[in-house]
Amino acid sequence: MSRQSLTKAHAKITELSWDPTFATPATRFGTDYTFEKAPKKDPLKQIMRSYFPMEEEKDNRVYGAMDGAIRGNMFRQVQQRWLEWQKLFLSIIPFPEISAARAMPMAIDAVPNPEIHNGLAVQMIDEVRHSTIQMNLKKLYMNNYIDPAGFDMTEKAFANNYAGTIGRQFGEGFITGDAITAANIYLTVVAETAFTNTLFVAMPDEAAANGDYLLPTVFHSVQSDESRHISNGYSILLMALADERNRPLLERDLRYAWWNNHCVVDAAIGTFIEYGTKDRRKDRESYAEMWRRWIYDDYYRSYLIPLEKYGLTIPHDLVEEAWKRITDKGYVHEVARFFATGWPVNYWRIDAMTDKDFEWFEHKYPGWYSKYGKWWEEYNRLAYPGRNKPIAFEEVGYQYPHRCWTCMVPALIREDMVVEKVDDQWRTYCSETCYWTDAVAFRSEYQGRPTPNMGRLTGFREWETLHHGKDLADIVSDLGYVRDDGKTLVGQPHLDLDDPKKMWTLDDVRGNTFQSPNVLLNEMSDAERNAHIAAYRAGGAVPA
């Protein structure tokens, strides 16, 4: 289609939009933003006629690659360590995709721009397609991988797992609260423009290095749609900037959106890339190096900083703090250790780091071994049942962490934990920004201005409180993380499937009572709580 005819077709489509004059349309998805002065343009002029043939070709390539992987015996070559982590990743990622599809009607309802509506409708179809091909990828892994246990329960496990529910919080952020906050700033301006770089570009590179060339095929097909989504987000952002009343809301939302994306996406993707790989070439980029290139340089410096020319205050401090958490404070390494600590309630297996892994980590992150090496050696020592408990219940110098109420990732950088009484409950937060998000941003008033559409962070946000006082075996059984024999756990702290004696069963984990740190915190006296918090922040043992 020629550019001229495309422009004419696009203009014709916008004529189909109309506003009723006989009644005031009901506002289904509310926003506190105003758009009376907004320019109405769609720079990409997206229309269905040119869209569908392109997507059909991409789908043909994806499904052709899936067929080729089976015929080419890819599953004889792929690393088990890598595919085990895909049980968690592929249980989570289709949900944010389908949530993004659900977010598009929110944006259409909130933004008075017929041109943008067309692009948002195209994006909705994109997101449904992304979720579909990811679900098909997961099914193919399940049908062909040596250990399908975990892949076969991902939709159920995602919803009741201590890690999966972090991903659920992330995806629900696209469809809850203020429509522009959720569907545009949080989803499109930050998540899609910044963090899909590590998600859909850096991670496929790691997959290929571990013998998995299906994930790169699928996720590069996804990423090739993101330029249109970025255009949608930028167009709505410029519309919002046209009205000075929106500036405080934009600055609020950029802080919240940036920090929550960092907390969740860097925790997950950083762990998958750093701890899910067997490729330990010294010239391979670490996650910190990838982050510097894909997010700090390509997003922050090229996209975010130029917004200052519109008078917008950019959260420079939060970008620098995120970088510091990754490089200096060991954020990704703390997340990996936390996931490994929780192996009995995982639906994927996590093997111990080896000497080769130690050498690579020490090369990329000097001082890594002194902080994490001994713990991973203990993890390896306690890998098999019979003589010990699961590592979470052994004395290995690791205190089970408090959960962040906002992002739901635990407060793993312990010196930064914030404890405050909010809504008559003592809550823990991983950082000052997560506390601000709960206590200030998601409230009915912001800087003296009513913000009734923001909503609140509510619900059972701490997985641990749901299982306080239960026996570990009962928790695993209730969650459904048991193999077909009715006794062997799906999660294991090793990759040895050949010897049944090395596989942990319900009987092996029975007798260990699980306790919620937050429940215990709220039961403490003021003096006990203060002492507990001080010890936790110091990284030491909790006083008796």
From Swiss-Prot:
The keyword Oxidoreductase belongs to this UniProt entry's keyword annotation: yes
Record-listed Fe cation 2 binding positions: 127, 192, 226, 229
Induction field: By propane.
Free-text disruption phenotype from the record: Cells lacking this gene are unable to grow on propane and to degrade N-nitrosodimethylamine (NDMA).
InterPro entries, A to Z: Ferritin-like_SF, Phenol_Hydrox, RNR-like
Keyword Metal-binding on entry: yes
Gene3D superfamilies: Ribonucleotide Reductase, subunit A
Family classification: Belongs to the TmoA/XamoA family.
Biological role: Component of the propane 2-monooxygenase multicomponent enzyme system which is involved in the degradation of propane via the O2-dependent hydroxylation of propane. Also able to catalyze the oxidation the water contaminant N-nitrosodimethylamine (NDMA).
Protein name: Propane 2-monooxygenase, hydroxylase component large subunit
Organism: Rhodococcus jostii (strain RHA1)
